[in-house]
């Protein structure tokens, strides 16, 4: 009873803090000169990380096994992983706008985990025989950590694409306006004034565009490194899962839905890393591959749980509304 109450308190505290954090991040992003809300939001994210750590520890003690046996526990661990990835850059770069993106996905995952949709699996259960193995910690934790890193890195790539295509759109719009001015043959002075005004607004070297260019470089830099880390975790997770499968079922690979989608995920991000070796494909081109990977990961993570089939169906669930 005490553990259940403590778990309930930590869950709601962590969700409340992360809700406040994302609000502060949005304020900081809109007003770039505001420093205090940013510092407060980062401290709040650290507090969220500590609450989630306490929640997982409490559930581990209460259930008697590592809390990765069902969808609810994996979502909490995924939120914990997101918050960990969020706070690591904070100690390296005290002021980093990229954390707004990672905070957003943290609150989304935490919100879904604590929502009424998963009420039936909030309570700890006895581990099924197939999961009673030391490989549970190694395999599942590596897979969830890889999902967290790959999702964060892919989300940064999505943001890079949005900003890049938005800049292209406004740039082409400005060029069309210049051509329109030329076609109507305005007076030379009027045309030059109009052209100078447009250049002042759209020049790449203006303060606003310079900030965007720097932000795009940061997105590209961090997305590549976070995805690389996630790819390593994914590789370790797949290999450890193959060893565990051989011990449990007598075969390293059986092509069940989870294994198939994990392999597809691995292939997609292997292609992404390959594109990074070609300078002509870096930036927006590789970001398109990462964006595809973002969708593939969610299919891999939720697909089997929604279908409830295959050898990995232990964490399947049914949506319930209360």
Curated annotation (Swiss-Prot):
Subcellular location(s) of the protein: Plastid, Chloroplast thylakoid membrane
Domain of life: Eukaryota
InterPro entries reported in the protein's UniProt record: Cyt_c_assembly (IPR002541), Cyt_c_biogenesis_CcsA (IPR017562), Cyt_c_biogenesis_CcsA/CcmC (IPR045062)
One annotated Gene Ontology cellular component of this protein: chloroplast thylakoid membrane
One Pfam family matching this protein: Cytochrom_C_asm
Membrane topology, from the record: Multi-pass membrane protein
Primary localization: plastid
Record's keyword terms, sorted: Chloroplast, Cytochrome c-type biogenesis, Membrane, Plastid, Thylakoid, Transmembrane, Transmembrane helix
Any one Gene Ontology molecular-function term assigned to this protein's record: heme binding
GO biological process: cytochrome complex assembly
Subunit structure and binding partners: May interact with Ccs1.
Job of this protein: Required during biogenesis of c-type cytochromes (cytochrome c6 and cytochrome f) at the step of heme attachment.
Protein name, entry field: Cytochrome c biogenesis protein CcsA
Taxonomic source organism: Helianthus annuus (Common sunflower)
Higher taxonomy: Eukaryota, Viridiplantae, Streptophyta, Embryophyta, Tracheophyta
Gene: ccsA
């Amino acid at each position: 009873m005490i553990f259940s109450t403590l778990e309930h308190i930590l869950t709601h505290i962590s969700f409340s803090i992360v809700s406040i954090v994302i609000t502060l991040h949005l304020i900081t992003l809109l007003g770039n000169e505001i420093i205090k809300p940013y510092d407060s939001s980062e401290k709040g994210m650290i507090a969220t990380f500590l609450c989630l750590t306490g929640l997982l520890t409490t559930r581990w003690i209460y259930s008697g096994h590592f809390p990765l046996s069902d969808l609810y526990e994996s979502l909490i661990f995924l939120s914990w992983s997101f918050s960990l990835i969020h706070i690591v850059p904070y100690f390296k770069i005290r002021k980093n706008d990229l954390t707004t993106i990672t905070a957003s996905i943290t609150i989304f995952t935490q919100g879904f985990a604590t929502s009424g949709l998963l009420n039936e699996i909030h309570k700890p259960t006895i581990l099924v025989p197939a999961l009673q193995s030391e490989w549970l910690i190694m395999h599942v934790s590596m897979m969830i950590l890889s999902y967290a890193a790959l999702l964060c890195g892919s989300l940064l790539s999505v943001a890079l694409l949005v900003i890049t295509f938005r800049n292209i759109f406004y740039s082409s719009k400005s060029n069309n306006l210049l051509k329109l001015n030329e076609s109507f043959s305005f007076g030379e002075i009027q045309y030059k004034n109009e052209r100078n005004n447009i250049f002042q607004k759209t020049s790449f070297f203006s303060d606003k565009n310079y900030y965007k260019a720097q932000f795009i470089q940061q997105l590209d830099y961090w997305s590549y490194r976070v995805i690389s880390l996630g790819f390593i975790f994914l590789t370790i997770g797949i290999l450890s899962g193959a060893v565990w499968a051989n011990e449990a079922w007598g075969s390293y690979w059986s092509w069940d839905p989870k294994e198939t989608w994990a392999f597809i995920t691995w292939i997609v991000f292997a292609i992404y890393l390959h594109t990074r070796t070609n300078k002509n494909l870096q930036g927006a081109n590789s970001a398109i591959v990462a964006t595809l990977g973002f969708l593939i990961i969610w299919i891999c993570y939720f697909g089997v749980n929604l279908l409830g089939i295959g050898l990995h169906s232990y964490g399947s669930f049914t949506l319930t509304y209360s």
